């Protein structure tokens, strides 16, 4: 069982997850021409919070995650809410090719968990239809205190470094904008702030 499997059932109890998703959804709506003809993919969809917020703005969303626990929660949400344009899928793009194209690929707080950033950007590019869009929300470079010790993740990202990787993959019109800030307290009850960017690019 992965760590995400073990926390799937309680994930939505943290209000930050909903607040962050709302901020990202609002920024995506402002920065991208979302419409009901779009077929979208959320990669690393977790419990589907962001996809549910965007479900009325898009035609169809494939909610993909490699955690069985997270996908089970998404399936229950879709059934309980009778949402017909959301499809939960358990799949890992880092390991296998997914033979479908999309008008929009988006994710939040997923990129720092992916080892080979250049490879996943190329995968996203190849999965986009001509003129399609990419939207990625993640941490700016941080000192490692966001996740703490013994977690194998990237410590946030320098936007300029990501720009180079995106252009190398074939993307154009790469833009970054701060969209949310996470506030956390350390062991000494001191507050620390972690800004999150929204990256957008087009094929």
Segments predicted by a language model, with ranges:
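Conserved class I S-adenosyl-L-methionine
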Residues: 1-35, 50, 73, 135-161
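Short alpha-helix
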Residues: 155-170, 176
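A short glycine-rich, Lys/Arg-flanked "PGG" loop and its adjoining helix->strand segment in the class I
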Residues: 118-130
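A conserved beta-strand element that flanks and buttresses the S-adenosyl-L-methionine
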Residues: 106
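Class I SAM-dependent methyltransferase SAM/SAH-binding core
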Residues: 41-95
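Short catalytic micro-motifs in class I SAM-dependent methyltransferases
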Residues: 109-113
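Core SAM-dependent methyltransferase catalytic element
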Residues: 182-203
